[in-house]
């Protein structure tokens, strides 16, 4: 069964609405807790000094990584009922979703574990934490008696956010950059900006809050923000 998560690269208002809705929903004991990012993370994005060399290009703002989605192949068939019965912090409701949902606290992540042996891990804040969490889930499965391996680890999406701390004229931005932009405020309050290089989707809000998604590497998040910042500054509200 194909994994169905909120769109990681929203390209129209309906997808963007679904994307942001996933941010706002409560995660406790629900399949919907596989949010792209959590609401508390987006409400107050952190600002960091760029002197650490992590990006920002001298702007003085560095996007914060909010969520990393990775996939792993455990390379064996799994009995999901057995996993749900014997593993901690695991739930399985096949009528609702064809995967075991498992959580660990360190790194704080959630895994979707499928009978095919495929696994999706969400919630990590760094690439290293994503890989560490994925290995921990694989070890849990191994300890339950399955011949699980750790194959084909791949980061599928990195989400970042930031706040430029000034209001933005979204109508003007949409008009001037119509080739890349979609802005339909009656459907979704943010402007959807589809950057070509790097291939990143940005959700830009009038408040100055920005969500960046679709990256495979963190540098793509930083590069996209460096590229969009002068544009945002051009359409700063007085």
Curated annotation (Swiss-Prot):
Region described as Disordered: spans on this chain: 1-58
Xref: SUPFAM superfamilies: TATA-box binding protein-like
Cellular localization per UniProt: Nucleus
GO cellular component terms, A-Z: RNA polymerase I transcription regulator complex; transcription factor TFIID complex; transcription regulator complex
Residue ranges the record marks as coiled coil: none
Top-level taxon: Eukaryota
Record's keyword terms, sorted: DNA-binding, Nucleus, Repeat, Transcription
Recorded family membership: Belongs to the TBP family.
Function text: General transcription factor that functions at the core of the DNA-binding multiprotein factor TFIID. Binding of TFIID to the TATA box is the initial transcriptional step of the pre-initiation complex (PIC), playing a role in the activation of eukaryotic genes transcribed by RNA polymerase II.
Protein name: TATA-box-binding protein
Organism (species): Candida albicans (strain SC5314 / ATCC MYA-2876)
């Amino acid at each position: 069964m194909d994994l169905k998560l909120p769109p990681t690269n929203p390209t129209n208002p309906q997808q963007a609405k679904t994307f942001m809705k996933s941010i706002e929903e409560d995660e406790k004991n629900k399949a919907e807790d596989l949010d792209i990012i959590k609401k508390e993370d987006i409400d107050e994005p952190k600002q960091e000094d760029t002197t650490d060399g992590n990006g920002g290009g001298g702007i003085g703002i560095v996007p914060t990584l909010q969520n990393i989605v990775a996939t792993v192949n455990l390379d064996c068939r799994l009995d999901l009922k057995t996993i749900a019965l014997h593993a901690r912090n695991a739930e399985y409701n096949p009528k609702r979703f064809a995967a075991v949902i498992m959580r660990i606290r360190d790194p704080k992540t959630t895994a979707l574990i499928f009978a095919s042996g495929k696994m999706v891990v969400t919630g990590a804040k760094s690439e290293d934490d994503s890989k560490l969490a994925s290995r921990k889930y694989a070890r849990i499965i191994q300890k339950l008696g399955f011949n699980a391996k750790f194959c084909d680890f791949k980061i599928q999406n990195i989400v970042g956010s930031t706040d430029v701390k000034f209001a933005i004229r979204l109508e003007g931005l949409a008009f001037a950059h119509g080739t890349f932009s979609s802005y339909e405020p009656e459907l979704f309050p943010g402007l959807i900006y589809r950057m070509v290089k790097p291939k990143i989707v940005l959700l830009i809000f009038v408040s100055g809050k920005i969500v960046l998604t679709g990256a495979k590497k963190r540098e793509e998040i930083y590069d996209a923000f460096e590229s969009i910042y002068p544009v945002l500054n051009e359409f700063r509200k007085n």
